[in-house]
Amino acid sequence: MISDRKLEHLILCASCDVEYRKKTGFEDIEIVHRAIPEINKEKIDISLDFLGRELSSPVMISAITGGHPASMKINRELARAAEKLGIALGLGSQRAGVEHPELEGTYTIAREEAPSAMLIGNIGSSHIEYAERAVEMIDADALAVHLNPLQESIQPGGDVDSSGALESISAIVESVDVPVMVKETGAGICSEDAIELESCGVSAIDVAGAGGTSWAAVETYRADDRYLGELFWDWGIPTAASTVEVVESVSIPVIASGGIRSGIDAAKAISLGAEMVGIALPVLEAAGHGYREVIKVIEGFNEALRTAMYLAGAETLDDLKKSPVIITGHTGEWLNQRGFETKKYARRS
């Protein structure tokens, strides 16, 4: 049953090593330090408008859970934190709630606790018929369509037929009255796919790159035969490289997620052109201790982001996107071989 699988996923993410063994690529990114920032750190503004909503910070809580009674507490605490902080919150796949109405409460609790926060619904690309209900269920401000071919390939009994996915995404865009964004689930999005997605009419793309939670790893723990999961544990496009590939290829907003573990990572992602960053695993453990702990985590990210901006001489997020950045190592090699010019980032002003 879907509900039982959701619980397994939640337990595994909270208690096992499910992160990529390779890096996000942000270790190859350096923001050029300014010894004379010429700004007042106290006046740095990290607020933004995203898909028509005013947010206090570009740090959002990415989709984590839903669909099992045990997930209700997690979503409640995350929603309380999002409401108090004025940030966006993404929910886990709502398929379980649509197919089993008795589980709707594990999702609707988010809107009950966060009446004014930006909530992002979540369905799979093949479930066109679930789109409207998913939005209605939580009065969503936007709908995320998740892509997870890697996870499905490793998951016992997974759906490995992606035929017609782009057509389905286009239909979902047409079927709902809120912005639709597309997100990967930990393996990243390349330039070619980003261009196709923009042509489908989506309003934003969340790269959800490699370097954070590996869903191949999660499914490895669930499988009787772990060979395939072990083999593909680190499969995917590192988050930093995926962020540049997508930012350089489309004109819609990009969210960088996948292994964002600090405000410095957030600053680096935004300096590469991301509008927002998403975090999940860092707040999962905190949510078990209550929304105040979640708030502490987010505020820690925000303070580190402001500090990085100060040291870059960036008073706003737009200023940070213009700050010079050095791209080296594996990320630089990846991008150069893929035809993206990295030197232009180094001489921005």
From Swiss-Prot:
Mg(2+) binds at E152. Belongs to the IPP isomerase type 2 family. This is Isopentenyl-diphosphate delta-isomerase. FMN binds at S62, A63, I64, T65, S93, N122, K183, T213, G259, I260, R261, A280, L281. Its EC number is 5.3.3.2. Involved in the biosynthesis of isoprenoids. Catalyzes the 1,3-allylic rearrangement of the homoallylic substrate isopentenyl (IPP) to its allylic isomer, dimethylallyl diphosphate (DMAPP). Substrate binds at R5, K6, S93, Q94, R95, Q151. It catalyses: isopentenyl diphosphate = dimethylallyl diphosphate. Keywords: Cytoplasm, Flavoprotein, FMN, Isomerase, Isoprene biosynthesis, Magnesium, Metal-binding, NADP. One of its GO terms (biological process) is isoprenoid biosynthetic process. Its cofactor is FMN; NADPH; Mg(2+). Coiled coil: none annotated. It comes from the Archaea. GO terms for cellular component: cytoplasm. It comes from Methanothermobacter thermautotrophicus (strain ATCC 29096 / DSM 1053 / JCM 10044 / NBRC 100330 / Delta H). CDD domains: IDI-2_FMN.
